């Protein structure tokens, strides 16, 4: 079904593209929010990525790669937003949780710890981590999406994972994994 919508959109069918956007906008926004940590910037990046996708859709060679292509556009927009220097205060940047809106207090505490850990990462490390763990991208797919070699993608995911683990251990004052040192 998605391939049919993509092919129709590539042929100029605005309704087909609108349906693709409707189907994917929540996930795109969630990814942008995780990367940028700001609701307004995430919304701007999502809208701009969808605009660029519509404008440049005819450049897409393989309709089966639409989702990966769209995520690549979104990541570029997130980087652009992050570099633009627009910043929100911490209070303005707080966004109601996406995944755990009605979760019990323990899940909210975990979400807060994860958000604090993500905040400590650079946008490059945070993006690699989100693509790998949230979207399930393989290392070559991350490299393709970010325009970096697979080895660089691997090192970013590894480093981000190490830093997140260390942050979670420090924040929760949990015992360290085997060997007594962060991994």
List each language-model region with its residue ranges.
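N-terminal module of bacterial RNA polymerase sigma factors
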Residues: 1-27, 34, 116-119, 166, ...
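Internal acidic/polar
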Residues: 2, 80, 88-118, 138, ...
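Short, charged helix-capping/linker segments at alpha-helix termini
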Residues: 8-19, 29-48, 150, 173
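Sigma70-family region 2
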Residues: 10-11, 37, 48-65, 84-86
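C-terminal flanking helix
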Residues: 25, 29, 50, 122, ...
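Arg/Lys-rich amphipathic alpha helix in sigma70-family domain 2
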Residues: 55-62, 72-93, 107, 159, ...
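Helix-turn-helix DNA-binding module
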Residues: 116-127, 131, 135-152, 163-166
